[in-house]
């Protein structure tokens, strides 16, 4: 999701984009570091909205602190860590970056609803095993994890954290990861990002 410093006065994603277009290069976005999910989500928004905003990379959550302090304009963050900050009015939520509205924030529009469908970005997590793990072990791990994700207590806990689980087969997850990596490479090229040492 896209959150902004309350001191900036943005109420919608359109507000941020309007200012960014009127004053190219003046707005800033923080990230948890170059190439991090928060960086790539903001780059996807930057490219989709055709705005000139400056990236200020940090190590970890320090960038979010700078947004709350009003020294940086916006940040892209998963739903779970954002909700308490939104509720405490430490950040202003402008849009969620997922395809659908977040269950914990049903009144917040998606980036697509705000007019930028190409800015969709999914913050996701998964479980992986070393590359040479025998297939039988991988499938056993998958089965155990799937059983856990079907437990009502686990589903309820994930929902309270803003996590929407997706049960994929091993093969579907392999394809999902490959597709996501390919899309990230395309984004990196279109955003003119270069690898760092």
Region annotations inferred by a language model:
Residues 1-62, 74, 111, 124-157:
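Hinge/capping helix and adjacent helix->loop/strand transition within the periplasmic-binding protein
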Residues 12, 70-71, 78, 90, ...:
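Conserved functional loop/turn residues at catalytic and ligand-binding sites
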Residues 20, 44-48, 62-75, 80-88, ...:
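Short helices/loops that flank or line small-molecule/ion binding pockets
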Residues 26, 34, 50-73, 85, ...:
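N-terminal (or domain-start) structured segment
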Residues 28, 73-77, 92-95, 184-186:
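Paired acidic/hydrophobic, glycine-rich loop segments that form the ligand-binding mouth/hinge
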Residues 48-51, 135-197:
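An extracytoplasmic/periplasmic, membrane-proximal ligand-sensing/linker region
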Residues 58, 76-78, 96, 121, ...:
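Short beta-strand and adjacent tight-turn residues that come in two discontinuous sequence segments
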Residues 82-150:
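C-terminal lobe and pocket-closing loops
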């Amino acid at each position: 999701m896209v959150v902004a410093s309350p001191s900036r006065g943005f109420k919608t994603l359109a507000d941020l984009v309007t200012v960014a277009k009127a004053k190219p290069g003046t707005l800033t976005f923080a990230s948890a570091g170059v190439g991090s999910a928060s960086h790539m989500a903001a780059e996807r928004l930057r490219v989709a909205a055709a705005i000139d905003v400056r990236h200020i990379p940090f190590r970890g959550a320090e960038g979010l602190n700078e947004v709350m302090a009003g020294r940086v304009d916006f940040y892209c963050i998963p739903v779970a860590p954002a909700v308490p900050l939104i509720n405490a009015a430490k950040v202003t939520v402008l849009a969620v970056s997922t395809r659908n509205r977040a269950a914990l924030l049903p009144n917040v529009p998606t980036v697509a609803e705000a007019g930028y469908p190409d800015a969709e970005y999914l913050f996701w997590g998964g479980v992986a095993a070393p590359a040479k793990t025998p297939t039988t072990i991988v499938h056993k791990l998958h089965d155990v994890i799937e059983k856990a994700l079907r437990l009502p207590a686990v589903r309820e806990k994930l929902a309270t954290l803003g996590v929407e689980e997706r049960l994929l087969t091993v093969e579907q997850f392999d394809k999902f990861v490959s597709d996501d990596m390919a899309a990230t490479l395309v984004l990196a090229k279109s955003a003119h990002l270069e690898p760092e040492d």
